[in-house]
């Protein structure tokens, strides 16, 4: 479903915890990180689409979150032609998004990346609200910055921590990584590549993924052809 200008209606989600840290998900079998987002289906309102995408991508239900705010208008980004299927070039231009700021009132263990048969993420982490966006695919960065900036007016004073920063396994900082492995938002990158560094990064990522799946066990845009870019 495209508008007259060739943009597909979409919702984006910035999910906060009590410390004003933001949820980031790692794209399935990729080394890029992003916020939950997805298309608005015919007949859906943006709010309905937001709750559906929230559950599909994070496993969270409406009772696990509180809506704090949303962008006043659509924010748009264009998808480069090389990522658009040939048969729709000239018609499809990109996405227009309403962004929602949510605060999580549930527990970290309520997050489950395998709530559906087609998960979007294979790892997740909490990170500071303001971080460099180098890990985000380039054509989405401006929209991320606009959404974060507009919605920052709703931020409140964070709750004091009961544990040291990074004490929770989902929020721990990754070690320095070689340039072939993208770090999570805000994490540092190694200046040179070594076999030990790459091995360590992969081992940490595998451990994080296994831990997430263990915790959760108890509790597509047709115009875009590149993996990880459909939403």
UniProtKB/Swiss-Prot annotation:
Q: Which SUPFAM superfamilies match?
A: Nudix (SSF55811)
Listed GO MF terms: pyrophosphatase activity
Task: Look at the named UniProt entry and state the broad enzyme category this protein falls under.
Answer: hydrolase
Keyword NADP among record annotations:
no
Highest taxon of the lineage:
Bacteria
Q: Which UniProt keywords apply?
A: Hydrolase
Give the InterPro entries listed for this entry: Nudix_hydrolase (IPR020476), NUDIX_hydrolase-like_dom_sf (IPR015797), NUDIX_hydrolase_CS (IPR020084), NUDIX_hydrolase_dom (IPR000086), RppH (IPR022927)
Q: Which segments constitute the Nudix hydrolase domain?
A: 6-149
| Enzyme Commission (EC) number | 3.6.1.-
- Mind telling me which CDD domains this protein's record contains? NUDIX_Ap4A_hydrolase_plant_like
Q: Keyword Oxidoreductase: yes or no?
A: no
- Motif Nudix box: residue span? 38-59
Q: Name one Pfam family in it.
A: NUDIX
Region (Disordered), start-end ranges: 157-190
Function field: Accelerates the degradation of transcripts by removing pyrophosphate from the 5'-end of triphosphorylated RNA, leading to a more labile monophosphorylated state that can stimulate subsequent ribonuclease cleavage.
What family classification does the UniProt entry report for this protein? Belongs to the Nudix hydrolase family. RppH subfamily.
Q: Which named protein is this?
A: RNA pyrophosphohydrolase
What is the organism of origin for this protein? Paraburkholderia phymatum (strain DSM 17167 / CIP 108236 / LMG 21445 / STM815)
């Amino acid at each position: 479903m495209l508008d007259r200008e060739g943009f597909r209606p979409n919702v984006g989600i910035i999910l906060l915890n009590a410390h004003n840290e933001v949820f980031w998900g790692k794209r399935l079998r990729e080394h890029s990180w992003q916020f939950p987002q997805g298309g608005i289906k015919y007949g859906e309102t943006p709010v309905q689409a937001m709750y559906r995408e929230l559950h599909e991508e994070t496993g969270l239900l409406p009772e696990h979150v509180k809506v704090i705010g949303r962008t006043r208008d659509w924010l748009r980004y264009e998808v480069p032609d090389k990522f658009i299927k040939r048969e729709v070039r000239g018609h499809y231009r990109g996405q227009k998004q309403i962004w929602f700021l949510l605060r999580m009132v549930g527990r970290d263990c309520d997050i489950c990346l395998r709530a559906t048969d087609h998960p979007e993420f294979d790892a997740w982490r909490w990170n500071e609200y303001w971080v460099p966006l180098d890990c985000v695919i380039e054509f989405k960065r401006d929209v991320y910055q606009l959404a974060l900036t507009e919605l920052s007016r709703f931020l409140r004073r964070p709750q004091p921590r009961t544990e040291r920063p990074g004490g929770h396994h989902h929020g721990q900082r990754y070690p320095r990584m070689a340039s072939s492995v993208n770090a999570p938002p805000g994490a540092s990158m190694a200046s040179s590549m070594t076999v030990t560094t790459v091995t360590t990064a992969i081992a940490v990522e595998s451990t994080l993924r296994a831990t997430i799946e263990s915790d959760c066990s108890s509790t597509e845009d047709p115009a875009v052809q590149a993996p990880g870019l459909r939403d």
